[in-house]
């Protein structure tokens, strides 16, 4: 299964070519998965560069992180990223709350000083990249499944024929591209907006695995009403629940959640 996933990532998601360099980054790594990626990279004539990390160590580093330290890390990794043709990140965690006690001001500083130049300004526009999660007992627990059953489910959706899926998406993409008004209604949600002229993009296994959505965006000042999310969202180790946004002419004028102060921070 890892071998097939590695083929999907190398040959399809980032379409690595002979002589190209790929940065492989895995958190709480599975040696079998990393090995499969290295082997597949060599099989297509590419050059793998591997970085392995552990969430517990990352937490300790972040708790004492200074801005000067983050700047040095950013300088080194930005230079490395600029030499890469592709980037594969596989994120895994035994405890989804591992970073919950990292101070918010440090997290914000790290995002500004490190993530912005390395990932937002370099990786996103300059490399072929794909990001995915990796199955763990923690993820299985969230899905209320056994670890074995969750792993079977995970690999079955990650190893789909995404080329076939891409073709099946075309009719919906065409419909979205000619749509103007959208009205969403549901429990706690009554939202209207326009998508006229925005276009639609297929997510068919190139940037994220597993994949399968077709996305668009609203005309910026056309969004009005309220939207309430019925699923939790993990951000920097904190679990937001009952998130609700109220929009007026495209601007969020009210945001609430299980920790309203934190979400407005």
Placement of each model-derived feature along the sequence:
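Active-site bordering "gate/hinge" segments
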Residues: 1-225
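Short, surface-exposed charged micro-motifs
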Residues: 183, 242-244
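Broad, structure-driven detector of short, well-ordered beta-strand segments within folded domains
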Residues: 193, 245-247
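Short, catalytically relevant binding-site loops at active-site mouths
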Residues: 199-200, 233-235, 259-262
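Structured beta-strand/loop patches that form or line metal/cofactor-binding pockets in enzymes
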Residues: 219-238, 242
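C-terminal, non-catalytic macromolecule-binding modules
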Residues: 248-265
């Amino acid at each position: 299964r890892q071998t097939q996933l590695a083929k999907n990532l190398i040959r399809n998601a980032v379409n690595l070519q002979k002589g190209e360099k790929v940065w492989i980054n895995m958190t709480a790594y599975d040696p079998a998965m990393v090995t499969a990626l290295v082997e597949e990279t060599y099989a297509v004539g590419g050059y793998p560069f591997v970085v392995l990390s552990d969430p517990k160590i990352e937490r300790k580093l972040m708790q004492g992180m200074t801005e000067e330290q983050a700047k040095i890390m950013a300088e080194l990794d930005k230079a490395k990223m600029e030499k890469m043709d592709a980037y594969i990140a596989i994120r895994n965690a035994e405890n989804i709350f591992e970073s919950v006690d990292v101070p918010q001001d440090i997290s914000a500083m790290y995002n500004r000083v490190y993530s912005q130049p390395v990932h937002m300004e370099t990786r996103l526009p300059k490399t072929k990249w794909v990001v995915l999660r990796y199955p763990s007992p923690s993820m299985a627990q969230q899905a209320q499944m056994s670890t074995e059953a969750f792993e079977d489910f995970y690999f079955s959706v990650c190893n789909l024929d995404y080329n076939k899926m891409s073709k099946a998406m075309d009719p919906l993409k065409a419909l979205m591209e000619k749509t103007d008004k959208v009205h969403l209604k549901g429990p706690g949600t009554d939202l209207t907006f326009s998508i006229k002229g925005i276009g639609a993009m297929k997510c068919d296994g190139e940037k994220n695995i597993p994949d399968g959505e077709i996305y668009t965006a609203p005309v910026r000042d056309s969004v009005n009403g309220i939207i309430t999310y019925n699923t939790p969202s993990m951000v920097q180790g904190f679990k937001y629940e009952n998130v609700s946004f109220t929009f007026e002419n495209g601007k969020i004028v009210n945001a609430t959640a299980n920790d309203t102060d934190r979400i407005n921070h």
